[in-house]
């Protein structure tokens, strides 16, 4: 059977770090308030010369280097973002041009914080059809550009960044590296719980992020538990078989709840929310690359990715690294 295996990963962060103390000087909040409710201690914020595309390019170059392959061998680029450089063309085409992957398929997907899971499943499907042999799957965001910096309930939660993986199609059995199972879902009836109040078709403005946090949390815990069970059932494995869970880094409380639902110790959960905050579509690949590079995630490990975002959208993928 054809399997899409992760051959390398990379990530990128803006230069500027913003601490909770610095935010407390701007809005009515404190380090203690933010840490207690979210687990976040700092975040990275893009400068005037840093964009979703430039972060994506840096993460992609590192992923290609880690995979030991050259850009011209990439057949497909799928970039997940809710904060593209432009309404069009796709930010993926900017990455394609910068890397020199001339002529390859390149497009964006938009599923907010679930975007990387949607992009990964899309690339996996295209590789299995034979339409492409190697793919770059990227999650990249500059969420700082759509935040209301007067709203302390949301501006403290998010940061900017990018993560990328190289996928390669190869024959393999269930023990070989590759994506074992994926599930995606959406529920548009909940769109007004997490959204941006602007857009080119409605207000002709970018708008700002709006969120009803308690309701989002309640839905997230249930939806993520359900989709994780679906993926485990599809793959024919149990939660105890998982070596690592790489969740969307929304906040520490959701990460704790996910671990409890799976019956896993927090030691098996990759946590970067304290350093990176919520980087939306970049969150999962950024956390994955962090854990690969610091030696936690090793070849052969069984890794679960999961995320939920505005829409609502949510999904999970089980990967043999």
Curated annotation (Swiss-Prot):
Coiled coil: none annotated. It catalyses: malonyl-[ACP] + acetyl-CoA + H(+) = 3-oxobutanoyl-[ACP] + CO2 + CoA. InterPro entries: ACP_syn_III_C, ACP_syn_III_N, FabH, Thiolase-like. It is an enzyme of class 2 (transferase). Residues 249-253 are annotated as: ACP-binding. It comes from the Bacteria. Keywords: Acyltransferase, Cytoplasm, Fatty acid biosynthesis, Fatty acid metabolism, Lipid biosynthesis, Lipid metabolism, Multifunctional enzyme, Transferase. Its main location: cytoplasm. One of its GO terms (molecular function) is 3-oxoacyl-[acyl-carrier-protein] synthase activity. One of its GO terms (biological process) is fatty acid biosynthetic process. It is found in: Cytoplasm. PANTHER family: 3-OXOACYL-[ACYL-CARRIER-PROTEIN] SYNTHASE 3, BETA-KETOACYL-[ACYL-CARRIER-PROTEIN] SYNTHASE III. Homodimer. The last Arg residue of the ACP-binding site is essential for the weak association between ACP/AcpP and FabH. Belongs to the thiolase-like superfamily. FabH family. HAMAP family: FabH. This is Beta-ketoacyl-[acyl-carrier-protein] synthase III. It comes from Erythrobacter litoralis (strain HTCC2594). The lineage of its organism: Bacteria, Pseudomonadati, Pseudomonadota, Alphaproteobacteria, Sphingomonadales.
